[in-house]
């Protein structure tokens, strides 16, 4: 609702929309909490919930690592990306810093199809880093559920994103989103603040690869060096309500 009042996003209607901004309110989409429920999901390796994810979620990571041919190690920082592979999704930012992103501690699992340049980009990196990158150039709902349950973090560096659903699903599975502050991503992900231990994800403002990598590295620091704070952030994310009932109530 705020972005469409700007010249960049307003498509010529920004003046009218700005004049009537008091009449507008953005309402985000919802997700099906029955379909996306780690406690009952039959598509994941091991079920879990907010009370026991500390002891059970990692099993999903190890099993997915084994299935995809990655190095099996629960201590690896697994980042998931489930997306249409298009310019909108910020994939050029990933390309610019990929060699720094997938260090010895990090794995990236990609699921999606789209523009050939990005499909081939991820295929190349999977060839270059076979133990660290898994490029699944397809869409498999079963595999997507497994990744939501297995990953530690979920990357969405979108150029623009009117709402977005995958960050909501990742919250549901205790997977921490790393997003660019645009559209619905800004509305749904509250940036982590280490000073008051608040927030439920990580975000960066500018469409800039180095800024994105800096935030990813910061998230890894919290994951490895401040595990209690990380788990508390997961708790807050899983407690969010992005069901359709919540969206209906706001409407």
Features from the language model and the residues they span:
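Catalytic cores of nucleotide-sugar-dependent glycosyltransferases that transfer UDP/GDP/TDP-activated
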Residues: 1-251
């Amino acid at each position: 609702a705020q972005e469409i009042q700007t010249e960049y996003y307003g498509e010529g209607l920004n003046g009218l929309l700005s004049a009537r901004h008091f009449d507008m309110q953005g309402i985000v989409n919802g997700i099906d909490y029955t379909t996306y429920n780690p406690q009952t999901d039959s598509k994941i390796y091991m079920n879990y919930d907010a009370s026991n994810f500390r002891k059970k979620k990692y099993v999903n990571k190890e099993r997915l690592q084994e299935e995809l041919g990655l190095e099996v190690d629960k201590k690896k920082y697994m980042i998931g990306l489930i997306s249409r592979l298009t310019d909108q999704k910020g994939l050029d930012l990933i390309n610019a810093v990929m060699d720094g992103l997938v260090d010895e501690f990090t794995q990236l699992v990609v699921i999606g199809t789209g523009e050939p340049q990005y499909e081939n980009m991820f295929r190349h990196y999977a060839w270059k880093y076979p133990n660290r990158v898994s490029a699944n150039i397809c869409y498999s709902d079963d595999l997507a559920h497994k990744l939501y349950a297995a990953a530690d973090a979920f990357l969405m560096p979108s150029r623009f994103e009117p709402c977005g659903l995958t960050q909501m699903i990742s919250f549901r599975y205790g997977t921490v989103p790393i997003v660019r502050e645009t559209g619905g991503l800004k509305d749904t992900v509250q940036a982590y603040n280490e000073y008051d231990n608040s927030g439920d994800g990580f975000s960066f403002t500018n469409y800039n690869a180095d800024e994105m990598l800096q935030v990813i590295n910061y998230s890894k620091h919290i994951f490895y060096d401040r595990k209690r704070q990380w788990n508390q952030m997961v708790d807050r994310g899983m407690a969010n309500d992005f069901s359709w009932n919540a969206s209906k109530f706001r409407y």
